[in-house]
């Protein structure tokens, strides 16, 4: 066990940030004498034997750049370096702040709530060039607090909302993914979404799976004259697979 939790190899070239302290046997070395287990999406166990300290995080930070460094460096600064031999006195104000900070939050896109393009693109059908993901067309229907995406992919017409400004109620993502068995696509995941106008002609949205499986889609719509260009990235394990890359669509009259 001593060898497993001790630096056996260096990993400076292959990694960056907090992960450059070396690697043992299935354990990552931590700065200042600790070691850790690292799971997907910022699920960590940070262990410091000298301080008799273990910290567990169960975050889902997929798609958030530098989240791992932020979590681990905040731990070093605010917890490890603040350790004392005796317990701190009761501090109701600090406990109230901790309770507020510990509530789960989803990252919010900042931007404008509307744009002239909301009216211009409302209900317009955009037909895509041939693409590897099978998208044929998409249209966006804007209301006061949401935009409904309707699209055809692989011969199936589906739809889901992006809520403008704030996260709206949960909804079932229309494309089925794995449920109890990873090889059977029979489950629609519960999701939450939010969007905002980043530029006058650019709408940006997030879709987060908040079910037994966690993951997210980041999607950007850019409108120029009669075209809509989509850029999407997905951070998920074995689902949201078609929501990545670029799509170019042209407006057509129905």
Residue ranges and their predicted role:
Residues 1-6, 17-20, 237-249:
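Intrinsic structural disorder
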Residues 2-58:
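Active-site Gly/Thr loop motif
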Residues 39-108:
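Structured C-terminal helix/loop/strand segments within mature extracytoplasmic catalytic/sensor domains
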Residues 89-254:
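Peripheral terminal and inter-domain segments
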Residues 34, 61-62, 210-214:
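Short Gly/Pro-enriched loop/turn and capping motifs at secondary-structure junctions
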Residues 17, 65-67, 139, 208:
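A generic "cationic amphipathic patch" detector
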């Amino acid at each position: 066990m001593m060898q497993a939790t001790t630096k056996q190899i260096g990993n400076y070239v292959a990694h960056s940030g907090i992960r450059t302290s070396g690697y043992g046997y299935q354990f990552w070395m931590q700065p200042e004498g600790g070691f850790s287990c690292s799971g997907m999406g910022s699920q960590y166990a940070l262990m410091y034997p000298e301080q008799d300290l273990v910290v567990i995080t169960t975050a889902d930070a997929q798609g958030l750049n530098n989240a791992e460094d932020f979590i681990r460096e905040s731990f070093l600064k605010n917890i490890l370096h603040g350790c004392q031999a005796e317990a701190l006195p009761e501090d109701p104000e600090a406990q109230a702040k901790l309770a507020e900070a510990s509530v789960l939050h989803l990252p919010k896109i900042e931007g404008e709530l509307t744009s002239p393009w909301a009216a211009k693109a409302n209900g317009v059908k955009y037909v895509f060039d041939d693409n590897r993901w099978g998208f044929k067309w998409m249209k966006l229907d804007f209301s006061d607090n949401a935009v409904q995406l309707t699209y055809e992919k692989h011969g199936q017409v589906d739809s889901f909302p992006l809520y403008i400004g704030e996260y709206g109620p949960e909804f079932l993502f229309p494309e089925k993914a794995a449920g109890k068995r990873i090889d059977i696509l029979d489950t629609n995941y519960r999701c939450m979404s939010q969007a905002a106008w980043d530029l006058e002609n650019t709408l940006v949205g997030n879709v987060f799976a908040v079910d037994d499986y966690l993951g997210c889609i980041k999607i950007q719509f850019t409108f120029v004259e009669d075209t809509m260009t989509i850029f999407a990235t997905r951070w998920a394990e074995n689902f949201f697979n078609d929501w990545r890359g670029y799509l170019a669509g042209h407006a057509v009259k129905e």
